[in-house]
Amino acid sequence: MRRQEAGTSSLATRVGPEVLTTAAVASVTGCDDPLAAVLLGRPKVIEVLQRSAELIDRVPALAAAHHQIADYHAMRSRFFDAYLADAAAEGIRQCVVLAAGLDTRAFRLPWPDGMTVFEIDQPTVLRYKENALTAHGARPAADWHPVGVESDMPWPRRLWESGFNHNEPTIWLAEGLLPLPDATQDALISEIDGLSAAGSRIAFDDVLGMCSGRSDAPGWLTSRGWWTDVVEARHLPELSGRRDDDAQSYTAHAALVTAEKIA
């Protein structure tokens, strides 16, 4: 099931797109995340990357677009890294990563003592990641709970069964998951809202101004007691301390949204 098709009962993703996102971040950052190198070095991943590289190399315009997308993904990743680390430093002790894929934040971020990280995705994706990292000897920096969810399972129930406490503030991350079809997106955000105690936070990327009448996720949150901030992605190079505009065309309609539940 593709991210764009993820329903409210399933936050399933495929290994393929997550491999490409991980590769994109690694390529732009000089692979300074050793865990990304671990995940990219396994045979089935190398096969995916080789097929993708062959397709990209055939079309110069596609190669240029790939570089822009990779650049954006790397900047987006660093933005969310900082947001999650700051929220944890301010006292939140549980984080839920939706459609986690090959995300390694449970292992590589400087989580404080007592931090719990839940990762929701297809069981096959989470098993692949766990096996690769375990074989490498990597250890999570938090109390890590991979939450495997099949397509016919309600993900909130699986989250509760894994030890999630909805009475405590939560940091939610939905990186690369939105936008979704209107009804699906509204239902997903409503479920997150219902599971969030006051003081909870959420971070996600969205596409703004592309489709008139499309469900407005930041507006939905604001109307339900969340303080919302929107950073247009075209400002990411500046926020990253860079002056180039390589990612400008790709980020023209992208935005990074963060919000805190006030009531």
Swiss-Prot record:
EC code(s) of this entry: 2.1.1.-
InterPro entries: Ppm1/Ppm2/Tcmp (IPR007213), SAM-dependent_MTases_sf (IPR029063), SAM_mthyl_Trfase_ML2640-like (IPR011610)
Keywords: Methyltransferase, S-adenosyl-L-methionine, Transferase
SUPFAM superfamilies found in the cross-reference section: S-adenosyl-L-methionine-dependent methyltransferases
Example GO molecular function: methyltransferase activity
Chain positions recorded as S-adenosyl-L-methionine binding sites: 121, 150-151
GO biological process, one term: methylation
Pfam families in the cross-refs: LCM
Transferase keyword on record: yes
Function: Exhibits S-adenosyl-L-methionine-dependent methyltransferase activity.
Family under the similarity heading: Belongs to the UPF0677 family.
NCBIfam families linked to this entry: mthyl_TIGR00027
Protein name stated in the entry: Putative S-adenosyl-L-methionine-dependent methyltransferase Mkms_0098
Organism: Mycobacterium sp. (strain KMS)
